[in-house]
Design a protein with these regions (language model features):
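Transition-metal
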Residues: 1-138, 198-225, 250, 332-338
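Short beta-strand segments in beta-sandwich/barrel cores
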Residues: 260-261, 277-282
Length: 338
């Protein structure tokens, strides 16, 4: 049972979804919160039947609960379209050099959202690296020549990677994750990727994977930026914002003790992603309800949950036997929606 801001009652709860595993030629992905068609998350911690039954899809929950799920401004802006996708990427080998279109181009070509994303590196092997952005200015003509002769990586900025590193990848930024990295990815609800260079390797079906070099040419931002990595200073028991953009805000929590989160101010659903350790996320205790009615979920490393807007008064309770618990908190800052 969740209590709304003005003691409004609804039967929503903190939600966990069944992970969706996807095998890739370079490793694997695990989609933990998704409303992408053909890959939609379904409820894992629901009831045996009813509106919150196990197996109910995320899009169906959004349609049923509307603003109580998404928040009022999100509901007015997105309607029944859940705006974010959360996945874990486990790269054993290098991913393709790629880029994603912005909203305007994606809507024009594919009838969907664009794809802006961010990465939080959870594990990185010795010598781990990734590509993000250009290190020198090139023209669309030079781009085509370098894709053709296989030298495109020579003009990309290569970053050495360590655990805890954060990279913001706006639509239009050329990029690639390389082998030996496991990361959490938060992005817009979109599965549109323009593959530019794929090391001349076959896919899992033995056939060469399709490239989208012409589509990518118009989607790429050729600007050279002074930095591509996000710097931040984490604090104990005090959330720190690490990404803020029109599509999502991400904060990191490093917690050693329970603390209370009043999330109503966001007017948004909130996603929690466990990066390390484990913790309980539970309804904040209220006099109005007995303790037995408090909704609780447990997250371990690599798990996530969604806190609907109607359940936005919670406690984060770490398992101190496991040391420091590290969480990402994700929501949509919808003040710009008016």
């Amino acid at each position: 049972m969740c209590v709304g801001k003005n003691t409004y009652l609804c039967n929503m709860k903190i939600l966990k979804f069944t992970p969706i595993y996807k095998k890739k030629v370079w490793g694997s992905e695990t989609w933990v919160v998704s409303a992408v068609p053909e890959s939609t998350s379904v409820l894992e911690n629901g009831e045996t039947d009813g509106e919150l039954a196990n197996g109910v899809s995320l899009p169906e929950l959004v349609r049923r609960y509307g603003a109580d799920f998404l928040g009022r401004k999100n509901w007015e802006h997105f309607g029944a379209e859940f705006p974010l996708l959360v996945k874990f990427i486990d790269a054993h080998d290098d991913l393709s050099i790629q880029v994603h279109p912005n909203d305007e181009l994606a809507q024009e070509r594919h009838g969907c959202m664009g794809k802006t994303e961010m990465w939080f590196v959870m594990d990185a092997g010795p010598g781990a690296r990734l590509y993000s952005g250009f290190k020198e200015r090139i023209s669309p003509y030079e781009y085509e020549k370098r894709v053709e002769d296989g030298s495109i990586t020579d003009v990309l900025q290569c970053h050495s990677v360590n655990r805890g590193d954060v990279f913001f990848i706006p639509a239009g930024r050329i990029h690639a994750i390389c082998g030996g990295i496991r990361l959490a990815e938060i992005q817009q609800t979109s599965d549109v990727t323009y593959r530019i260079f794929d090391y001349n390797r076959p896919g899992l079906d033995g056939k060469m994977r399709e490239l989208h070099t012409e589509l990518a040419k118009d989607a790429i931002d050729y600007t050279v930026y002074p930095t591509y990595q996000t710097d931040y200073l984490s604090k104990i028991n005090n959330p720190v914002a690490i990404t803020h953009c029109p599509y999502f805000t991400v904060k990191i929590h490093n917690i050693t003790r329970p603390y209370h989160r009043k999330l109503y101010k966001y007017d948004s659903f909130v996603i929690y992603i466990c990066l390390n350790g484990d913790c309980m996320i539970r309804e904040h205790r209220r006099r109005l309800f007995p303790k037995s009615n408090m909704d609780t979920v447990t997250l371990t490393k690599g798990e996530s949950c969604v806190v609907p807007m109607a359940c936005a008064d919670i406690d984060l309770v770490p398992n101190n036997d496991r040391g420091l618990t590290e969480l990402l908190e994700v929501y949509v800052d919808n003040k710009k929606f008016g």
